[in-house]
């Protein structure tokens, strides 16, 4: 299972995260076929048409959606998706996702694909091959990482495909959250730094 997550495999791309019932002696082939059938039932022809119109591949969409899911709850899916799409847009001044859910930032190891999955798989951070680190560290790789970091649900996939953001997120390149679950969006780095201070103040008050 860990290996499948590491390589951003077809299993991650088409494994719909739902509750399934299987017989105890069922086969792996049937497990996978069931996962694929569920994904294909949810991903409509209209969604495929929208994907084609945008020039995205299914693996790219699911990779983006996996970051949306890890960074947001359903209420913020579209806003976070819009921020990431703004960063990925042609001519963007910030062409990297810079998501702490897959990065070298150790302080966010509680929800960090590289620290929680990749590093243990290879025996430690220092043992991660350079090509793997380069492919999944969103602070160093330009554009999308090599594959998904989780199996996103339908809500995250829809948001990644056709986000419907609030006004505050439409032109944003940055966001930060506080421990109360508030999201702060910004267009400029200066605005983002101010939001970080606001979020830090909220967090400090909660801890006092």
Regions found by a protein language model. Give the residues of each.
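Positively charged, low-complexity/disordered segments
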Residues: 1-8
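Bacterial extracytoplasmic/cell-wall-associated proteins, especially those involved in peptidoglycan
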Residues: 9-10, 14-208
């Amino acid at each position: 299972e860990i290996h499948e997550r590491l390589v951003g495999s077809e299993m991650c791309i088409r494994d719909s995260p739902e509750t399934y019932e299987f017989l105890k002696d069922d086969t792996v082939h049937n497990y996978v076929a069931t996962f694929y059938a569920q994904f294909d039932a949810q991903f409509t022809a209209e969604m495929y048409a929208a994907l084609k119109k945008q020039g995205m591949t299914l693996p790219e969409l699911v990779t983006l959606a996996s970051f949306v899911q890890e960074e947001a709850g359903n209420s913020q899916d579209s806003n976070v998706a819009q921020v990431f799409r703004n960063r990925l847009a042609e001519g963007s001044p910030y062409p990297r996702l810079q998501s702490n859910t897959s990065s070298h930032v150790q302080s966010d190891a509680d929800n960090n694909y590289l620290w929680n999955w990749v590093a243990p798989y290879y025996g430690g951070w220092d043992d991660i091959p350079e090509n793997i680190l380069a492919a999944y560290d969103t602070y160093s790789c330009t554009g999308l990482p090599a594959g998904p970091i989780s199996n996103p649900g339908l809500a995250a996939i829809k948001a990644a495909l056709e986000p419907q953001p609030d006004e505050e997120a439409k032109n944003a390149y940055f966001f930060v959250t506080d421990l109360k679950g508030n999201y702060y969006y910004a267009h400029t780095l200066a605005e983002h730094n101010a939001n970080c201070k606001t979020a830090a103040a909220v967090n400090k008050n909660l801890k006092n």
